[in-house]
Design a protein with these regions (language model features):
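Glycine-rich, acidic/polar active-site loops that bind/position phosphate-bearing ligands
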Residues: 1-201
Length: 201
């Protein structure tokens, strides 16, 4: 998630689009589209893109990949977003909470563990379809939350985002649908065992 602003001097919004607007209603959607084309030209696969909840807030979701390649793609993605915005005379920022009173931006990292072709997080016999490995993985994230947060929320501004009421992860807990937990487990869809994963918010 990121914001487009008219300049880098003040958080003056570029658009007033809404969450998942289907029709392009703003200048930001064209910038987002151009960014997607640039990423695809570099071999980075994009799964989804949409306007986010806050004014001038956008999201581009990359196709999952193995960890090191995903880290490289993420850095390239961030540079592409900022550079294409700059080329078009606007400013893009991944700052967690540039404006008071609206949702901030986070980097929600979807994670799973594979052994060969088998998703080690999936267990058909569990009510949540989560294996013991997945539950231990989640437990580890929750147990070491105060240590991990120093890496995932390294700026003072990061903590301005972590307040109740704005879909921010304010509870060291996990859930299926509650977006105020640190870890969210997307619902299992029959036939999609390989998609079993956790989302670190």
């Amino acid at each position: 998630e990121y914001f487009y602003f008219k300049s880098d001097s003040a958080p003056e919004i570029l658009d007033r689009g809404g969450y998942f607007d289907l029709c392009p209603l703003d200048r930001g959607s064209e910038l987002r589209r151009n960014t997607i084309f640039a990423l695809q030209d570099m071999g980075i696969h994009v799964e989804y893109s949409h306007h986010e909840v806050a004014p001038s807030q956008h999201e581009i979701d990359l196709r999952y990949d193995e960890a090191l390649r995903m880290a490289d793609n993420t850095q390239t993605y961030r540079i592409a977003v900022k550079e294409i915005a700059r080329q078009n005379g606007v400013y893009a920022t991944f700052m967690p909470k540039p404006m008071f009173g609206c949702n901030g931006s986070g980097m929600h990292v979807h994670q799973s563990l594979f052994r060969g072709e088998k998703n080690e997080f999936f267990d058909a016999g569990d009510p949540y379809h989560l294996s013991r490995v997945a539950k231990c993985y989640i437990a580890g994230l929750l147990r070491y939350a105060s240590d991990i947060v120093a890496i995932t929320n390294q700026w003072v501004n990061s903590y301005k985002r972590l307040v109740p009421g704005y879909e921010a992860p304010v509870y060291i807990s996990w859930a299926r649908r509650n977006r105020s937990t640190m870890v969210r487990v997307p619902m299992y869809k029959p036939g999609k065992e390989k998609a079993t994963r956790i989302e670190y918010r």
